[in-house]
Amino acid sequence: MIRVIIERHQKEAKKGELIHLLRELRASAINQPGYVSGESLASIDDASIVSVLSTWQSLIDWRNWAKSETRAKLEKQIEPLLTEKPKVSIYQVMATE
C-alpha cells in the first residue's frame, strides 16, 4: 500500500475554485482500480497550502491514475489556480507491528 501527498500553493482569490476541483478529482479517483481513500488538508501555518493525501493499493495503481486522461483534464483546470507546480511525494506504508 502507498500514500501520495500532493502539496499545492493556491492563489489568494482562488480557494473556492480549487476546493471544487479537488472534490471533482477525488470523485473521479474513487472509480479507479486500487484507490483506497483520500482527504484534503489545509495548512494551519500557511493558508495558501492545500494538500491532498490519498491511499492506493499499489504504486502501479497510482501511476495509472496519475497518467489518466481524466486526471490530466482536471489538473489542467487546477494549474492556473496555483502559484507554483504541485509537489508530489509518494510513500510506502510500513508495517507497524
What are these regions (language model features)?
Residues 1-2, 17, 33-35, 45:
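Short, flexible segments with low predicted structural confidence
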Residues 2, 39-46, 76-97:
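Glycine-rich beta-strand-turn "strand-cap" elements at beta-sheet edges
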Residues 2-8, 39-66:
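Short, well-ordered beta-strand segments in beta-rich or mixed alpha/beta enzyme
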Residues 9-18:
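Short, surface-exposed ligand-recognition loops at beta-strand->loop->(often short) alpha-helix junctions
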Residues 19, 23, 70:
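Conserved GNAT-fold acetyl-CoA-binding loop/helix
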Residues 22, 26, 75:
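Short amphipathic alpha-helical/adjacent loop interface patches that line ligand
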Residues 30-37, 55-89:
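An amphipathic, aromatic/His-enriched active-site/gating alpha helix that lines ligand/cofactor pockets
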